[in-house]
Design a protein with these regions (language model features):
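Conserved catalytic motifs of the protein kinase core domain
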Residues: 99-101, 180
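The conserved beta1-alpha1 loop
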Residues: 106-108
Length: 249
């Protein structure tokens, strides 16, 4: 909490890593804020500014215990050395033995930030030992306009490199192995996962789940040359080549 002079007055200890939004008037002694995370659905809290305390005001009922899970934010180096952030959510008793399935999600475009948020469809995967990994690729706006621009047009390759480096980090740190990673993206993220097997065939991610983007709409023609030149094998006619499984919808 900061005053109008920009100085920090106090710090609110949130339930976990997550996303928060406040509402209220500047003269109020109490205000409300909404909080959500990868394992906590949207809840509303009432905050007492004088006491620096808050209490749960309203929350949906769920049939699982969010305390069974943990979310951490890690940083890894991309191909050019830039540090890239990634959120990892998994059960507290998970063993880093390189055998855990990973659901790796990325977007990396249009200045859109990927903040922590809840989805009920992820919970069964987490309960069964899976890891949900959400990587903040360049092209988003997590670190401002420079971060956005660094993943656009002739710098679009940075987005692919960031995503590949995320998968490599998860393997190197024994969260998983190359046979246990599913890469997922939709819309702009569909472009990302469609081209990943082209750019990193040696990683051989087992499964991709994506929607079809309008690939060339916002990309210079000459940037598309590396996409095709790095893929010497016909995609639709494999001629005995083994491509990662892809599901397009």
């Amino acid at each position: 909490v900061y005053g109008l002079d920009g100085k920090q007055i106090q710090e609110i200890q949130l339930p976990s890593l997550g996303s928060v939004g406040f509402s209220g008037n500047k003269d109020d002694k109490e205000c409300f804020f909404g909080f959500t995370s990868f394992t906590i659905p949207g809840a509303t809290y009432k905050y007492d500014m004088d006491q620096n305390t808050y209490e749960l005001y309203r929350a949906p009922k769920v049939q699982f215990n969010s305390d069974d899970f943990v979310t951490e934010q890690v940083f890894f180096a991309s191909k050019d050395g830039v540090k890239i952030p990634m959120f990892l959510t998994y059960k507290k008793d998970l063993k880093k033995d390189g055998k855990n399935p990973v659901f790796l999600y990325g977007y990396g475009g249009f200045g859109i930030s990927l903040n922590p948020g809840f989805s009920a469809t992820r919970i069964p995967f987490l309960e069964n030992g899976g890891i949900y990994a959400q990587v903040n690729l360049r092209g988003g706006s997590e670190y401002g306009e420079d971060w956005h621009v660094a993943g656009t047009k002739m710098q679009k390759q940075n987005v692919f490199d960031d995503f590949i480096s995320a998968a490599e980090y998860l393997i190197d740190q024994k969260y998983t192995n190359k046979d246990k990673i599913a890469i997922v993206g939709g819309s702009n993220g569909g472009l990302l996962v469609v081209f990943l097997p082209v750019f990193r065939d040696r990683l051989l991610l087992r499964h991709t789940d994506n929607s079809v983007p309008t690939i060339a709409r916002n990309i210079a023609d000459k940037l598309l040359v590396p996409y095709s030149s790095q893929n010497p094998f016909p995609v639709l006619h494999g001629r005995g080549c083994i491509h990662p499984e892809e599901r397009i919808y």
